[in-house]
Amino acid sequence: MAIKLENIKIEKSWKEVLKGEFLSPYFLEIKEKLVCLKNSGVTIYPPGNLIFNAFNLTPFDKVKVVILGQDPYHEVNQAMGLSFSVPKDVRIPPSLINIFKEINSDLGINEPNCGDLTFWAKQGVLLLNASLSVSAKIANSHKNFGWQIFTDAVIKTLSQKRENIVFMLWGNFAKAKATLIDAKKHLILTAAHPSPLAGGAFFGCKHFSKCNNFLISRGISPINWDLNYTDNQPF
């Protein structure tokens, strides 16, 4: 059975530029694998309505920055469809703590007490995981589902059809995606992964100031990385 475009709950600009992917056989296979798991009682994260959350919060023509993760968090109540992000009132994971520490060092912004990165997404930061789903308690369990074909297409489409996007690639897995990006049109920033397992090699990368300096130099409004700022905002 073919997938019907009208049944895919994703922001309309993404549906248009990615419609060839949604209608491809591999995408139907992804859907079938997820349905099979759910029918067998496996819990999948994030919830189905949040699988395309990154795309719904950051339309195709609004993307300024891409931060690439590997796969969603696999513990209960963590995954929300945004790489590195966790919902309000959920304990901030170690990698995100280190991201906040680097922002503090780089820009002097106080570390927030909340790990919800929706504020970044609404400003144009596409928080993209290479795999968009995971089975509960099993990290990277959907890496061979076909999601990476889809998200590689997302990166290539952004590279080809847009310009002046900042791609932040952290860790060897993400760095390997640089081959999908036209470095003449975009800024590619690479660093060690923010995970504590990387031994602190992420610190000092200054990606957040480099990102904003690049955007400003291209006449594009910079990202406000201060999550504390959201308390007084109407969205």
Curated annotation (Swiss-Prot):
It catalyses: Hydrolyzes single-stranded DNA or mismatched double-stranded DNA and polynucleotides, releasing free uracil. NCBIfam families: PRK05254.1-1, PRK05254.1-2, PRK05254.1-4, PRK05254.1-5, ung. This is Uracil-DNA glycosylase. Its EC number is 3.2.2.27. Keywords: Cytoplasm, DNA damage, DNA repair, Hydrolase. It is an enzyme of class 3 (hydrolase). Disulfide bonds: none annotated. It is found in: Cytoplasm. HAMAP family: UDG. GO terms for molecular function: uracil DNA N-glycosylase activity. It comes from the Bacteria. One of its GO terms (biological process) is base-excision repair, AP site formation via deaminated base removal. PROSITE patterns: U_DNA_GLYCOSYLASE. InterPro entries: UDG_fam1 (IPR002043), Ura-DNA_Glyclase_AS (IPR018085), Uracil-DNA_glycosylase-like (IPR005122), Uracil-DNA_glycosylase-like_sf (IPR036895). Belongs to the uracil-DNA glycosylase (UDG) superfamily. UNG family. GO terms for cellular component: cytoplasm. The active site is at D71. Excises uracil residues from the DNA which can arise as a result of misincorporation of dUMP residues by DNA polymerase or due to deamination of cytosine. SMART domains: UDG (SM00986), UreE_C (SM00987). The keyword Metal-binding does not apply.
